[in-house]
Curated annotation (Swiss-Prot):
GO terms for molecular function: trans-aconitate 2-methyltransferase activity. It comes from Rhodopseudomonas palustris (strain TIE-1). This is Trans-aconitate 2-methyltransferase. The keyword S-adenosyl-L-methionine applies. GO terms for cellular component: cytoplasm. Its main location: cytoplasm. The gene is tam.
């Protein structure tokens, strides 16, 4: 995919940050020395970590140059690293590994979660949140439109960039032997948005990118028009004209 677009991502900053707040609220650590924000994006989640633990050394890690530019502007006093989590190791003595909406994009992410959890000292925390929405209409419609002409050839591999998440029982069996405490839960958010076009704008910043990035501008416009029409049918307006975007997410908090 092309580089992430921080401006597009931040169009729904409040809604995207809420799961990070909910995840952070369940992290039991009171006074960590070192904290790492994996997949820090534009720094919205990193800011929460800095706010909660102002005395800690907080670093952010991301693969996107544009996201890191925004994060550095937001938090110039903190360190941000461009790195792929699959090849990155946290600094020795890191107490909290925080990952908001990143591991769904990481191939074989369960292996990576085990690796990171194994490297923590006793009492260290791995806190993870991932969208679990591939079976929602917002994402089903992406794949359905991509199978149609004239996009079928260019987008045949788009859906392969993100796998369906394992069941909670799979995460439990993989992670529990490595930690003293493990909490796993789902939360379903219902975001009130201004209409089907707002849903499209939301997913253009994340899940829709593998489907539109490969397309030239004319093909992208026709794809988005077809996709928007399906979204309008799948998400009817409420009494006040808003639409509700149902958004399930899985949360994992593991204490070493």
């Amino acid at each position: 995919m092309a580089d992430w677009n921080a401006e597009q991502y931040l169009k729904f900053e409040d809604e995207r940050t809420r799961p990070a707040r909910d995840l952070l609220a369940q992290v039991p650590t009171t006074a960590p020395r070192k904290v790492a924000d994996i997949g820090c994006g534009p720094g919205n989640s990193t800011a929460l970590l800095v706010e909660r633990w102002p005395e800690a050394s907080v670093i952010g890690v991301d693969t996107s140059a544009d996201m890191l530019r925004q994060a550095r502007e937001r938090l110039p006093q903190h360190k941000f690293i461009e790195a792929n989590v699959a090849h990155w190791a946290p600094p020795a003595g890191t107490d909290v590994l925080f990952a908001n909406a990143v591991f769904q994009w990481v191939p074989d992410h369960l292996k990576q979660l085990r690796r990171l959890l194994s490297g923590l000292d006793s009492g260290g925390v791995l806190a993870v949140q991932m969208p679990d929405n591939l079976d929602e209409p917002s994402h089903i419609m992406m794949r359905e439109v991509a199978l149609q002409e004239p996009w079928r050839h260019q987008l045949s591999k788009a859906a392969e960039l993100r796998d369906t998440l394992p069941k909670p029982s799979v995460y439990y069996d993989a992670l529990k032997p490595l930690c003293s405490r493990l909490e796993i839960w789902h939360t379903v958010y219902n975001h009130a948005l201004d209409g089907p076009e707002a849903i499209v704008e939301w997913v253009k910043g994340t899940g829709l990118r593998p489907f539109i990035d490969p397309l030239e501008l004319p093909e992208r416009k026709t794809y988005l028009a077809a996709y928007t029409a399906r979204i309008a049918a799948a998400y009817p307006a409420q009494a006040d004209g808003q639409v509700l975007l149902r958004f399930p997410r899985i949360f994992i908090v593991a204490v070493k």
